[in-house]
């Protein structure tokens, strides 16, 4: 494995996240909780494994496309919980397209996670839900295409 270069690695990871990644707040219905998550999915296994080597996530998953056989299979890397917040703090200075999402993402009150047998206060639950909704509102999916041209 190549020697790590923290500043360069964070800049490269930010570029990958800007182009192939997603930041979201996942809602777990089973225990009525929210947690932050960062995902990258792409066809290039080596790049996904590189992320896993430098920022160990949950795991690298192989994702098949059974519905459309013309689509390539992909590989997915993701981190969640406090690891996702740590990753975003590291790449934030280098983000471009997802910078606003990342800044909102970092407002997630993870330090207030309940321990065994304790529940979150309604105030924290509402704050987490609000951040999830705001983050969803920043996504461009489904908002139509913005077409522009420029004279060169």
What are these regions (language model features)?
Residues 1-152:
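Internal intein/HINT superfamily modules and their associated LAGLIDADG
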């Amino acid at each position: 494995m190549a020697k790590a270069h923290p500043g360069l690695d964070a800049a490269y990871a930010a570029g990958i996240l800007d182009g192939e990644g997603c930041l979201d707040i996942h809602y777990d219905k089973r225990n009525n909780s929210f947690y932050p998550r960062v995902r990258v999915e792409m066809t290039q296994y080596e790049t996904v494994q590189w992320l896993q080597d430098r920022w160990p996530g949950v795991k690298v998953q192989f994702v098949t496309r059974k519905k459309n056989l013309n689509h390539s299979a992909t590989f997915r890397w993701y981190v969640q919980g406090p690891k996702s917040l740590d990753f975003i703090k590291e790449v934030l200075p280098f983000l471009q397209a997802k910078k606003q999402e990342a800044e909102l993402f970092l407002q997630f009150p993870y330090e207030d996670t309940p321990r065994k047998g304790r529940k979150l206060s309604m105030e924290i639950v509402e704050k987490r839900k609000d951040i999830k909704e705001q983050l969803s509102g920043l996504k461009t999916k489904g908002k139509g295409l913005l077409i522009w041209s420029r004279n060169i």
